[in-house]
UniProtKB/Swiss-Prot annotation:
It comes from the Bacteria. This is Porphobilinogen deaminase. Binds 1 dipyrromethane group covalently. Keywords: Porphyrin biosynthesis, Transferase. GO terms for molecular function: hydroxymethylbilane synthase activity. SUPFAM superfamilies: Periplasmic binding protein-like II, Porphobilinogen deaminase (hydroxymethylbilane synthase), C-terminal domain. Gene3D superfamilies: Periplasmic binding protein-like II, Porphobilinogen deaminase, C-terminal domain. The porphobilinogen subunits are added to the dipyrromethane group. It catalyses: 4 porphobilinogen + H2O = hydroxymethylbilane + 4 NH4(+). Pfam families: Porphobil_deam (PF01379), Porphobil_deamC (PF03900). InterPro entries: HemC, Porphobilin_deaminase_cofac_BS, Porphobilin_deaminase_N, Porphobilinogen_deaminase_C, Porphobilinogen_deaminase_C_sf. Tetrapolymerization of the monopyrrole PBG into the hydroxymethylbilane pre-uroporphyrinogen in several discrete steps. HAMAP family: Porphobil_deam.
Amino acid sequence: MQSSGETDILATIGTRGSALALAQANEVRDRLARAHQVAPERIVIKTIRTSGDAIQDRPLFDVGGKGLFTKEIEEALLAGSIDFAVHSSKDVPTFLPDATWLPAFLPREDVRDAFISPRAASLNDLPAGSIVGTASLRRQAMVLRLRPDLKVSVIRGNVETRLRKLVAGEADATLLALAGLNRLGLQDRATRILETDEFLPAVGQGAIAIESRRDDDRINAFVKAIGDSETEVALSAERSFLALLDGSCRTPIGGHCRVNGDRIHFRGLIISPDGTQSYETTREGARADAAALGADAARELRERAGEKFFTLFAGA
């Protein structure tokens, strides 16, 4: 939407309607307003209900995996009813529609997972047989790898809903992204923060992605003003890794890239849903080679695990 006046709408953001999604969209809007020295009100936020929001009774890996939180928003983007979308990067499929791309990522929040429990100080302190509630296959697998004597049950819903279910006794503990708690001002709910060496995060965790139409030069220039180059490099490696390893919610995958000047350090993991089999690799290389480094790490794990690993657990 081209504008000329000081009160005209400059852009319309599409986002999910959860408190976390709106917090992320508002952060993008405020950063854009500061970068372009305009009133935040000139950037409108439009909420869009997605398939992932509508399905609350099953784990996402049973109903299509990745894309459930972005499909309807992408449809609005392609139809022109919004100018760009704001997503949690870990929800964005590795393969986008041909007409869209990710021109910018905000500076990354904390990538770690948080352990939350009213009954134990840590995952190790939970009594045998305790129930850990999560809808994430990665978190399920990593919990069972560390504590095979625990039980995992499905807890779906937004951050606040999952915390309410925990208080109501539907589980003894749950795991949530620390970034989401931070953005909602709920970081004090974290019982313990899980370090990445024991609990590798999801690809893209903690990063906010902007998706726009490739041919919309005005909007692309508009949003690139708030893009963070380090996050873009890290996500290039992580998403390249994910793309070669299925990248759906049916495959428990962890991946994290750290950027240090012109060098990057990548760690990747594939794991069976029951936590009994896992393959891990690390890579170091040049920042400019991020995508190739992530792809190389994925090829190594595919070769080491063998195709049987992926077919065996595809329906798990």
